[in-house]
Structure formats: structure tokens, C-alpha cells
Amino acid sequence: MKNKLKKKKNPKGTKKIKAKAKAHKVGTTKVKVKKKIYTIGTLHDLPSQIESYSDKESYSDKESYSDKESYSDKESYSDKESYSDKNILVKIFYEPEIRYLTPLEIETKPENKYCFFKKNNIKYIDFKNPSFLMKFLNERGEILPRRITGTSKKFQKKLKRAIKKCKHIGLLPYLTDGLR
């Protein structure tokens, strides 16, 4: 049996391709599957003014539209489709190694967050030490969330309370242009 596809032209203008019936093994017996018919779409001959260049030829090397025969003698392809009088240049251009618009997919492993206070066995957060508390503030003076600092819920509450006390006393500013 040949593995070639049979091509048939449908009178409606669509191209149908019949694929060879494939046999799948089920246990020790072979089961035949019905042939699949793929519809490819409407078949219209492209006008000769559309040229495809896969090699690097310049546009000026080709003939101009005035040298070619006009399309008024030929039948129209469809009422919906219209072609302009200018030459259309279609280039096949694909370089998979250059990707300008899409970002590169870099797979990075997220760092394991750990509670700084549990690791160093700190039970009490001193509110009188603003240089230590500044590590848990962003540049505008806001408290960093747990997902960034990696602290546990218990110590995040203690940290919040210590920072608020430090700001209330006046050791840390409430609002800043640039804390760091």
C-alpha cells in the first residue's frame, strides 16, 4: 500500500484530500479506521502580479507592472476580493534565532523565602533601632509585605507594631522622598 495522499478537486472550489486509512493495533488484532477528509479551502489562482522571493533578489531587478499584461481580460476572482494595480512583493522571511518583540523565556527557580527572625532566633523586635527596621521599609517609607520579606505572619505583625512605634516616637519618618 502506498502512503501517498489522494487529491480530488471539488466542484465548489474547495480542495479535499483523502488520507490513507490507518490501522491501529489493539491487542493482537488490527482495527481499521475510516478515512479522514481534510478540507483545505477555496482554490483560486493567484494573480501573477504577486511574486514570492525566497532568495535575496532586489525589487528593481523584476519587471514593472506596465510590462505585464493587464488583468481586465481575466475573470474576476470574487466580488469580495480586490487586487490593487500596484505590484505586491511577498517575501518569505523567518529567522527563529532573532526575537525582538517577545521576551526571552528564562526559567528561574524562585528563591526559598525564610523568616529572618526564626532563623536568627530573635524573639523581640526592638523598636528603638531604626537602622534595623529600615531593612523592612521601601524607599517611600512603607512596610514591605510578607511575600517580599519572607517573614512569618507572627513576626510580620510584631514588625508592623515596632515600625509604627518607631515612627510615632520620631526615629523613622512617616513620608520620605528617598529613605535609602
Curated annotation (Swiss-Prot):
Q: Name one Pfam family in it.
A: Ribosomal_S18
A single GO cellular-component term from the record reads: cytosolic small ribosomal subunit
The record's annotation in SUPFAM superfamilies points to: Ribosomal protein S18
Q: What are the UniProt keywords, alphabetically?
A: Ribonucleoprotein, Ribosomal protein, RNA-binding, rRNA-binding
- What processes in GO biological process is this protein linked to? translation
Q: Where is this region: Disordered?
A: 1-26, 53-82
A GO molecular function held by the record: small ribosomal subunit rRNA binding
By its UniProt entry, which HAMAP family does this protein fall under?
Ribosomal_bS18 (MF_00270)
Q: Outline what the protein does.
A: Binds as a heterodimer with protein bS6 to the central domain of the 16S rRNA, where it helps stabilize the platform of the 30S subunit.
| UniProt similarity note | Belongs to the bacterial ribosomal protein bS18 family.
Q: How does it assemble?
A: Part of the 30S ribosomal subunit. Forms a tight heterodimer with protein bS6.
Instruction: Write down what this protein is called.
Output: Small ribosomal subunit protein bS18
Origin species, per record, is Karelsulcia muelleri (strain GWSS) (Sulcia muelleri)
